[in-house]
Amino acid sequence: MNALRAIDFKRDDPNNVSVSVLDQLLLPYTTKYIPIYTIDDGFTVIKKMQVRGAPAIAIVGALSVLMESQLLLSEGFCKTQYYYNLNDWENIRSKIDERLAFLLSSRPTAINLSNALDEIKIVLDSASDLQTFKNNLFDYVCKLIDDDFANNKRMGDNGAEFLLNLLKKENFNEDFAVFTICNTGSLATSGYGTALGVIRSLWNDSKSKTQEGNPNKKVKLTESSPKMVQVFPLETRPYNQGSRLTAYELVHDDIPATLIPDSSIAYKIMTSKIPIKAAFVGADRIVRNGDTANKIGTLQLAIICKQFGIKFFVVAPRTTIDKVTEEGKDIIVEERNANEFKIVTGSAVDMQTNKPILDEKNEPITAKVGIAPENINVWNPAFDITSFEYIDGIVTEVGVFTKNENGNFDLSALH
């Protein structure tokens, strides 16, 4: 089975790299990659949410700077649509610095992009010329991508092992289910995923436990007997990342899943034949006290889980930690255009076959459909802030952080 890729980065020749990103607005029926040549291209795909997920945003942002630098070193530098004096390195440095600020404005809530651009500024300030900057930036971006993938696998195993050991301590030995919201998998990262990475690790572990006697079976993460046998992804309105993207990944990986409405969480807990033992969510920013900014709807999921005694975990790499901001109330929450709430985009479907209707190019026909009165006022925040008090653990690549005896997180080791 081919691995899902949100970002196609061809880097065999460091002097002639190419970047394209999967247009996630067209999923699940259409697979189309958008080439990235400049910082403007990176800004556009991030702003329009053609690429999303905090780690992927940071990677695409960094890659767009690399691509513009490569373009400046070629005869096609005029395509950047931005004035550089190529005979003056200080001018180039100043202009790139301005461009980094512009790029950051594409999605201000996600700390990963800010952290990556801060690192690029260090690379920029230490370079003596454009070629050196581009070469060092190539090394930085490659490390950013490779570290992200390796860290995702570590996070997945850390979170899965922690939950399974927790269930073992509770003498819980049954099959169980988990919640997740938005999309935190391969489509939101360099691969494997954060919160969805934990779910992948839980599923891989459950399969190893059903293969007794098979000498080629995978090593179990723990000796506990519970198995995750079902995932309940929330649809995640209004952009439907859960129904369009997470469901797409779960089907792709043959992980048993049932898509549920955002408004059905409590009722699903009360009526599920399979006990729901945990929720795993991603993060766009985690501040010093553990308050977490994530996709709108995360807070209500956390509150409901708290009410029903279901463990709630945030899964994110250290690059998502905001080392400066003390509390969630100080996080700037991005508000999106009203039409993104009032208008939905999707593929036309044949009601007899449930298959997409194709055009003359054999591609699914897409359309925008209004679902609200034209003149109704709309409040459309992209994120909400979940207080640390609702979070049972923060899963990172270096381990799982829980609260101390005073009920507080100490994340200083991640700073």
Curated annotation (Swiss-Prot):
Superkingdom of origin organism: Eukaryota
Q: Where in the cell is it found?
A: Cytoplasm; Nucleus
Pfam families the UniProt entry points to: IF-2B
Documented EC number(s)? 5.3.1.23
The record's Gene Ontology biological-process terms are: L-methionine salvage from methylthioadenosine
List where the protein spans the membrane.
none
What coarse category fits the chief subcellular location reported for this protein? cytoplasm
* Active site positions: 284
Q: In which pathway does it act?
A: Amino-acid biosynthesis; L-methionine biosynthesis via salvage pathway; L-methionine from S-methyl-5-thio-alpha-D-ribose 1-phosphate: step 1/6
From the UniProt record, list the reaction(s) this protein catalyses: 5-(methylsulfanyl)-alpha-D-ribose 1-phosphate = 5-(methylsulfanyl)-D-ribulose 1-phosphate
The answer on whether this UniProt entry bears the keyword Nucleus reads yes
What would be an example GO MF term here? Answer: S-methyl-5-thioribose-1-phosphate isomerase activity
Keywords from the UniProt entry: Amino-acid biosynthesis, Cytoplasm, Isomerase, Methionine biosynthesis, Nucleus
| HAMAP family per the UniProt record, alphabetical | Salvage_MtnA
What does this chain do? Catalyzes the interconversion of methylthioribose-1-phosphate (MTR-1-P) into methylthioribulose-1-phosphate (MTRu-1-P).
The Swiss-Prot or TrEMBL record describes its family as follows:
Belongs to the eIF-2B alpha/beta/delta subunits family. MtnA subfamily.
- Record protein name field: Methylthioribose-1-phosphate isomerase
